[in-house]
């Protein structure tokens, strides 16, 4: 996780949510907003995903943004969100929810998964693909992945 240090010592305070405020801090004034990041040799910080979006599949931590960045490059894909859905053996598995470019030839689920597997480790790629009409982006362009996951976890 990416942590910040607030010189005032206050850190971050969530309105009317003291539990969330406390969980964000590892020490007074040192807090996280839930971003996963890394720093390169030159000192540049790169945000890679949100901790809350991480999928744990068979003990492996999978960051959906990796597969999303690969699959959005496929000519068939107009928009994408990868989420964790239940898997009896693995706990969770990665599922790609995709809005397609209807003006292009249709790609199969296998073709899209193979496209991803050619570029990153197999375990980081979706095990299934679902074509959807809408990902529910808000006015800021953000996707509420918790809301997208909810229907898949109703019976779990």
Locations of regions flagged by a protein language model:
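AMP-binding/adenylate-forming catalytic core of the ANL superfamily
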Residues: 3-5, 12-13, 20-29, 34-124, ...
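Short proline/glycine- and acidic-rich turn/helix-capping motifs at secondary-structure junctions
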Residues: 129-140
């Amino acid at each position: 996780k990416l942590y910040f240090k607030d010189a005032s010592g206050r850190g971050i305070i969530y309105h009317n949510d003291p539990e969330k405020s406390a969980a964000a801090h590892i020490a007074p004034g040192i807090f996280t907003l839930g971003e996963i990041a890394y720093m390169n040799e030159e000192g540049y910080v790169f945000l890679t995903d949100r901790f809350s979006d991480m999928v744990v599949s068979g003990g492996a931590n999978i960051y959906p943004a990796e597969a999303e960045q690969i699959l959005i490059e496929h000519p068939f894909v107009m928009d994408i969100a990868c989420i964790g859905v239940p898997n009896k053996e693995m706990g969770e598995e990665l599922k790609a929810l995709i809005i397609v470019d209807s003006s292009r030839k249709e790609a199969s689920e296998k073709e899209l998964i193979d496209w991803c597997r050619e570029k990153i480790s197999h375990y980081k790629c979706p095990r299934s693909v679902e074509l959807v009409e809408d990902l529910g982006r808000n006015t800021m362009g953000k996707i509420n992945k918790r809301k997208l996951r909810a229907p898949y976890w109703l019976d779990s």
